[in-house]
A protein has these predicted regions:
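Short charge-dense sequence patches
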Residues: 1-4, 16-18, 108-116, 180-182, ...
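Acidic/histidine-rich catalytic neighborhood of metal-dependent amide-processing enzymes
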Residues: 133-219
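Acidic/His- and Gly-rich active-site-bordering loop/insert found
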Residues: 3-141
Length: 219
């Protein structure tokens, strides 16, 4: 029997690889919000996928914010006592390096050597410059092919949220209170919360999933 963790990890990776291929670079000098129309392509896709998972109120508002609610699956009296938890990520990517036509590469079973990126022989991720690579020997590592950025900031967070929602929907034995989902545009240009309606979002506590090592957290 396949382990549930393996299934969840497989779903997470599949989502991440799809999302990074969607161009969502934000722009510093734009007078629109979101700053680039391409961000709405991923926003609409995420809202549709959330609806398909049963989150009926999933929507993209006029500013490009994706929000949705995963209702509690606790008895009503218990659900009323627990806090509403928010999960937040941003869908735009950094404008300083091209994020169009991203070709992700999965390096299976990393062996500990420098990582050569196949799209550009001059692009090598060297262990001497990135000693943290040694913490991931034996794991799969995902990079771009070297011709673009990857977009893990923050499509890794987006994929984590979507995979977590899917897991909770498909595993009702995992009990939880109300969960609010918020995915924002334009974080990379400093405007991720510019039109974010905190009161409407309605979370008692919210956690941004954006960067960091496994298990790392900040207040």
């Amino acid at each position: 029997m396949t382990d549930t963790f393996d299934l969840t990890q497989s779903t997470l990776v599949e989502r991440f690889l799809r999302y990074v291929r969607i161009h969502t670079t934000s722009a510093e000098d734009s007078e629109t919000f979101p700053s680039t129309a391409c961000q709405l392509d991923l926003a609409r896709l995420l809202a549709e996928e959330l609806k398909q998972l049963g989150l009926a109120d999933a929507e993209v508002d006029g500013y490009g914010y994706v929000t949705a609610t995963l209702p509690a699956n606790l008895p009503p009296e218990e659900a009323a006592r627990v806090p509403v938890i928010g999960l937040i990520a941003h869908l735009d990517t950094y404008h300083g390096v091209t994020g169009e036509n991203v070709n992700p590469v999965v390096h299976r079973g990393y062996g500990g050597a420098d990582l050569a990126l196949p799209g550009d022989p001059e692009q090598v991720i060297r262990v001497v410059d990135n000693p943290e690579l040694q913490d991931f020997i034996g794991d799969d590592i995902i990079t771009s092919d070297g011709t673009t950025l990857l977009g893990a900031d923050d499509k890794a967070g987006v994929a984590e949220i979507m995979a977590a929602v899917e897991y909770m929907v498909r595993h009702p034995e995992f009990k939880h209170g109300p969960v609010r989902i918020g995915i924002t545009p334009d974080e990379e240009v400093g405007n991720g919360t510019k039109f974010f309606d905190v009161a409407k979002f309605g979370a008692d506590y919210a956690y941004p999933l954006d960067g960091g090592s496994p298990g790392e957290g900040e207040n």
